[in-house]
Amino acid sequence: MAALWVAGVGRKSLTVVASGAPRREFWSRLRKEKQPVVAETVEEVKKEPILVCPPLRSQAYIPPKDLQSRLESHVKEVFGSSVPTSWQEISLEDVHMKFSFLARLADDLGHAVPNSRLHQMCRVRDVLDFYTVPVQDRSKFDELIASNLPPNLKITWGY
């Protein structure tokens, strides 16, 4: 360790010299020289225009006539051929079995269970109830246009 000694005492400052160098020179050796900051060029990405009317999220779904037999055959494929007679009461607690069962049904019927309803599918009966409900792809405005409106009320899309 270098010996410190006071080189001079003034009224406003105290100069300390370590190993023969003034304080400013001592600390300046430890500082790294600052490199000039180079600004990177950023390419401007043009965004696509926002659509005026977003596409409909759900597609039309009409349940087939043989829905129960299709469901029963998928239950036998996924859960094995030794399915009890009350196949609608089979529990869907096993996540892997539930996924494979619902994925096969979605491929077969062309209509998938949305994520917001997956937690409600606890038994095969819940899945059957979901797939028996038909889905229309029309909005409320389309239904209003198709309904019998009074002559003083008219809905136009091209405004």
Curated annotation (Swiss-Prot):
InterPro entries from the UniProt entry: Ribosomal_m50
Keyword terms of this UniProt record: Mitochondrion, Ribonucleoprotein, Ribosomal protein
Pfam families reported for this sequence: Ribosomal_L50
Principal location class: mitochondrion
One annotated Gene Ontology cellular component of this protein: mitochondrial large ribosomal subunit
Cellular localisation: Mitochondrion
Protein origin, superkingdom: Eukaryota
Bridged cysteine pairs (disulfide): none
Keyword Transport recorded: no
Similarity comment text for this entry: Belongs to the mitochondrion-specific ribosomal protein mL50 family.
PANTHER family referenced in this protein's UniProt entry, alphabetically: 39A RIBOSOMAL PROTEIN L50, MITOCHONDRIAL, LARGE RIBOSOMAL SUBUNIT PROTEIN ML50
Subunit structure: Component of the mitochondrial ribosome large subunit (39S) which comprises a 16S rRNA and about 50 distinct proteins.
Name of the protein in question: Large ribosomal subunit protein mL50
Organism for this UniProt entry: Bos taurus (Bovine)
